[in-house]
Amino acid sequence: MLYELNHAFDLAARDDSVKVLILAANGPHFSSGHDLSDRSGIQDFQAVGNWGGFEKPGAEGRQAVEEEIYLGLCWRWRNLPKPTIAEVQGKVIAGGLMLIWVCDLIVASEDATFSDPVVAFGVNGVEYFAHAWEFGFRKAKEILFTGGSISAREALSCGMVNHVVPKNDLSVFTDSLAQKISKRPSMGLRLAKQSVNQSQDAQGFWSALQSAMSLQQLGHANNEIVHGIAVD
């Protein structure tokens, strides 16, 4: 699914008739997190990064895969040249956070909740480790330490979410927001997005993501030594 989503993002980014992208999900919940099924089909897709070594054994192969399909793809999506809006409802768990965090704006329904419980698996959190930037430092620690969730209203108060609306109004509100943005000059939007992203990068965002990814790989390696499996 990640490569299919990447293909859709690429098509939209290159289509001049597309002004704003909306990432939405069908059903009562936005995302239950990572698909932990077999990744052996990764070689069927065109890699976006240059890590290679996907078939190598042990930590080397696992890091290559996760640098590609998680951190690599998320970083591409975060830097798309057009405005992106995540439209979320219900539960947003673990990998679901990575999908919405790469978007420029987040509109949530009143029933939305957000969590990353993967410390329970013996690692630090999801691979696109933007927790401190999205939740704030102390709230990020609480969420990771406890495995708990925060509500849409709490996410709004800490600046992670832009708007909270009734569930029945979610799509209409998001479409209206996208329409409003689409009327702005595309060059101005592109430059505004790039400027804000670069301000974040100047504060060390990309370095923090890379460091957290390395620590996550340490957690996986420890699990393999202690428990015989990468995820405890």
Q: Regions from the language model: what does each represent?
A:
Residues L2-E4, S37-G41, G125:
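Glycine-rich, phosphate-binding/catalytic loops in enzymes
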Residues A25-G72:
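Glycine- (often His-adjacent) and acidic-residue-rich active-site loop
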Residues M1-P28:
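Conserved CoA-thioester-binding segment of acyl-CoA-metabolizing enzymes
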Residues E4-L5, L23, D35, P83, ...:
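Terminal peptide-recognition signature
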Residues I69-L73, E127-A130, K139, L191, ...:
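Hydrophobic alpha-helical segments typical of transmembrane helices
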